[in-house]
């Protein structure tokens, strides 16, 4: 069992920004990036994005996987120890905090590591619908983030579709209307769940329309490597009538699932499972436990906001360690 001053759990923009700051502060952070943790490859949601055009410093854009590879390399350059294992169990009841990986979490097994501070940066996963053709055209027409992807060339002046009936769906549809030739929102039920003001704005928007009692049943597109989505099969749930419509973009606005199960019952969560942090900080309700990135951000969920919150978490963890612990080399716990 090894002791570290600070452990970061996660592998996205928030986790690596925290690692960069902490390693530059010579705190020798350890980052557990996971091995398909929560079903996502190391690097988080950005690894599923082909082109990132809104992250500062890349005027021509950059691939999501390449951006995360660069962040990982920068973390390692300054001395972060990156471990490709998944933390499966945490004990946050007292310091030093204890943790186990998926390889040694049997009942009664010794923790693999202890830490004075822990940063939770486990992210959130966009819900998918598992439609036929979804896997083929994911990021080749299908996206779960209009703000991230809506401005890319394949969507400009093309018919776009949004699935969802809440405020997020309305907001994303109106955002996409800046780029697409038209935006159609598919709502399974006969009314919107969105707030009255958002529903009114959506229904009044000249480039947006809503199809109630309608679901998507299949994504159709080019039959070639990296082929693009071109059509969508939709069904009226009342009559069961189906039709194929022209659609060059499909955006899911059906929610996200925060990867907070690791700390459930130990750290305060909201009713959707997001970690609650003190406003303007990364502090959780457990002293010495910090959270950053999408696991605590249900509103923005952007790479740049995740990176910013990772910086905040690192600075606050550094201050916490300086105030409560003496600076010393990580060493085995006897």
Swiss-Prot record:
Enzyme Commission no: 1.8.1.9
Gene Ontology CC: one annotated term: cytoplasm
Enzyme class: oxidoreductase
UniProt GO MF annotations: thioredoxin-disulfide reductase (NADPH) activity
Textual note on the cofactor: Binds 1 FAD per subunit.
Residues reported to bind FAD: 11-14, 40-41, 45, 54, 148, 294, 301-303
Pfam families documented for this protein: Pyr_redox_2
The protein's required cofactors: FAD
Substrates-to-products reaction catalysed: [thioredoxin]-dithiol + NADP(+) = [thioredoxin]-disulfide + NADPH + H(+)
SUPFAM superfamilies: FAD/NAD(P)-binding domain (SSF51905)
Disulphide connectivity of cysteines: 145-148
GO biological process, one term: removal of superoxide radicals
Entry superkingdom: Eukaryota
Keyword field: Disulfide bond, FAD, Flavoprotein, NADP, Oxidoreductase, Redox-active center
Role, per record: Component of the thioredoxin-thioredoxin reductase system which may be involved in biosynthesis of penicillins and cephalosporins and may be important in determining the thiol-disulfide redox balance.
NCBIfam families the record matches: TRX_reduct
Family: Belongs to the class-II pyridine nucleotide-disulfide oxidoreductase family.
Misc note: The active site is a redox-active disulfide bond.
Quaternary context: Homodimer.
Name assigned to this protein: Thioredoxin reductase
The organism of origin for this protein: Penicillium chrysogenum (Penicillium notatum)
Gene: TRR1
